[in-house]
Amino acid sequence: MARDRPPLLVVDVAASGRDDPAFQAVLDALSERVVATAALVGLDAVRVPAAETGPEALLAALADSDAVVLTGGEDVDPARYGGDDAHEGRGRTFPDADAAQVALVLEAVRTRTPLVGLCRGMQLVNVALGGDLVQHLTGHVRPGDPRRSMVDHDVALDPDSDTARVLGTTDPVVRSSHHQAVARPGTGLRVVGRAPDGTAEALEHESAPLWCVQWHPEDEGARGDGLAALLRAARDATRGPGRA
């Protein structure tokens, strides 16, 4: 019997283990806005923490879902992309979450399960597919209180990109909060959007239904309906050809 609302898997980094309650609260609020927006566009969203779930259970959850969102959070472990473990800008990592999410990304691409990556989610997708990261950069996060860390800036999207089509613009004004970014794109990926300083801001895959953005369309101060547009694209792609 068909389900009335396609199930959406929202994968967070972790549900616990953080030293900063304010940062945890920010991440929870962002993910809850993904869940709420998903409901508005006709998706039934469930949040799952990757670190506590593990690869096997996360893949089982993916198999029961029609689309997936990877949310923001901590750094990707530099060991996964040849980064410097002693880098002065190295942040907190959750290696167990990385392992589970890498397995999920590979399976989602293989099965052509629609995937949306937000902030760290975009970085994780890139690393999972063999790319690497700029390990530390400045100017894309406001230091101090995580509740006030967002930075507003322009993005230039390739006019022929699917991301521009989905968002209905080639020049969105977005909200970012990150100190890492995509450097070399992974296999099958291409950068389709950049910030004024050249930082990669959007990724697409050559064949899989995948939309990754470095910014936070789920932030309460975000302009427009970018998050809803991305989730609608994922929803609509669940009905497309080529699904395994």
Regions found by a protein language model. Name each.
Residues 1-113, 127, 134, 138-151, ...:
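N-terminal beta1-alpha1 cap of cysteine-dependent amidohydrolase-like domains
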Residues 117, 121, 126, 130:
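Gly/Ala-rich beta-loop-alpha elbow adjacent to hydrolase catalytic centers
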Residues 164-174:
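Catalytic cores of DNA base-excision repair glycosylases
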Residues 188, 206-210:
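Beta-strand-turn-beta hairpins that frame and shape the catalytic cleft
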Residues 199-204:
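Short, surface-exposed beta-strand/loop micro-motifs that present aromatic residues
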